[in-house]
Amino acid sequence: MKKILASLILSAITQVAVAQVPEGKKVISSLYIHDLASGKSNLILREIRHFEAPNWSPDGKYLLINSLGRLEKISTMGDKLGELNTGNVKDANNDHGYSFDGKTLFISSAKPEIKEHTSFIYKVAAEGGEPTQITPASTSYWHGVSPDGKDIVYCANRNDNYDVYKMSVNGGEEIRLTSTEGLDDGPEYSPDGKYIYINSYRTGTMQIWRMHADGSQPEQMTFDAHPNWFAHIAPNNKVATIITYI
């Protein structure tokens, strides 16, 4: 069994009173970089606004966060480097990230012209530009891309149930990988491409699972009493970081 370490945080956002802030109270978002060797966390940005979902840039020089539907670049020292150009896609949510080769950015975003809540998946050049829509159906939330860059995996609501699906980065057939009742979410490929890690509520508590890349042979990886979400596998394929709610 692959070892899962819940205490490791590569980058994190802590937020105070994010949802439905009462009148007179403020939303405070904080961005940290945590050094795994020293165990020290460095606060690089704290502001009175809602921002979230930091992702390392392919060259490691900045972090990409989202705020109010836009994607912003923040240097590792906390300097604001401006918005990333995402063309007409201007209502991004917190599900975005880069391909393994660093050439492509995947974005999940609503369409303002559709009144009900939506989320579609797009791809765009890592340096920005006009995105191309991948998934035709909503709601679809991007979470991972295969190491060879050919397929994306994502969480999608189909027939009032959230499961994990796979599709070519160029669009096409939607392949269902999970079919359990309740939420299956957060799919991410292992660096060797053999496994997809997910978090699933199939046991009654959100836990980390992994399955073969074709969705077969699901295997539970965490067994504690706490809800565990979003496994991110280290490049060495030996450890993972997860979010645990205690």
Go through each PLM region and give its residues.
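Residues at the start of alpha-helices and the adjacent loop-to-helix junctions
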Residues: 4-11, 46, 88, 141, ...
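Conserved beta-propeller blade repeats
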Residues: 48-64, 90-105, 137-155, 181-199, ...
